[in-house]
Amino acid sequence: MKNRLSLLLTLIVAVVVISCKKTINYKNTSDFAGDPTDYFMSMQVGKYATYRLDSLTFYFYGQLDTTTSYLAKDSVEKSFTDGSNNQAWLVTRYLSDLSGSSWTASQTYTVTPSTQQVWVTENNLRYLKLASPVTEGLSWTGNSALPYAPYQDFFDYSDDSHLSLGAWNYTYQNVAQPYTLGTTKYDSTVTVLQAADSINVPIVDPRSFASKTYWIETYAKHIGLVYRHTAMWEYQPPTPNGSQTGYKIGFEMTMTLIDHN
């Protein structure tokens, strides 16, 4: 169960970007805010970022929900040359309770950065987190490298937005704008809205299907990811004959940066 939870957390925390729909000569564009790597964690051995993870899950046959909080530390461990002869980096994710007194290696993933894009590969799922150019309104099909129904081993989704993730459009928002988290203010950030769709949310009619799909990330310049909120859950209504009560499946998670070097 612990290994399954670690794998699920790793899958949840990962995000992708793949191909741009809009072509801009970004080096000559006045609103060009930097290369994608300017907004990603610096790939140097010893670099780390620590986050608080607040994870909402459903239990008791989807009748109840609970929020569990963790600490997650992503640490750059080493560099290597990948199969395409590109420099890549191995990152290990460690998990702890909120005390941070004991850390356990959860998963590893690889990062392949360039001035044009930042690729991430986790559990054989290939993601492109940031695309070029970093300009307001740039949109791209961010999940086109994912297979159909990538989370189906964990959740029996039925909503197409949870199955055909390749159709998601990512969009840059609030490019080069300040962003405040608690008492910390970041001078220059970019937000990536990946999905924002819902059906019957909040649930006003418990006799009808409901679904929530929301995925947003904010990156700070020269720091990396500072905030992520994800939600992919569904509500199945009771059967007409009463043989099955209504229930929820899926997850919702908030990830907030609390420390980095």
What are these regions (language model features)?
Residues 21-261:
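Conserved functional acidic sites
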Residues 1-9:
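Bacterial N-terminal signal peptides that target proteins for export
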Residues 16-19:
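C-terminal motif of bacterial Sec signal peptides marking the signal peptidase cleavage site
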